[in-house]
């Protein structure tokens, strides 16, 4: 049986990235909550060269 988590940086960024969050009202609320909480990372960050 195939596992449910098949890591891919592309799909990770496309679904949970900062720009995607900012694109909708609810996404902006997520960012706002994380800022208020003092999170170091507001959204997923994929290491790039």
Swiss-Prot record:
What do the Gene Ontology cellular component annotations say? ribonucleoprotein complex; ribosome
InterPro entries named in the record = Ribosomal_bL34, Ribosomal_bL34_CS
Q: Which GO terms describe its biological process?
A: translation
Keyword terms: Ribonucleoprotein, Ribosomal protein
The source's domain of life comes to Bacteria
Q: Which Pfam families match?
A: Ribosomal_L34
Which molecular function terms from Gene Ontology are attached? structural constituent of ribosome
Concerning its family, UniProt says:
Belongs to the bacterial ribosomal protein bL34 family.
The cross-references to HAMAP family, in alphabetical order and at most eight, read: Ribosomal_bL34 (MF_00391)
Q: What is this protein called?
A: Large ribosomal subunit protein bL34
This chain's source organism reads: Trichlorobacter lovleyi (strain ATCC BAA-1151 / DSM 17278 / SZ) (Geobacter lovleyi)
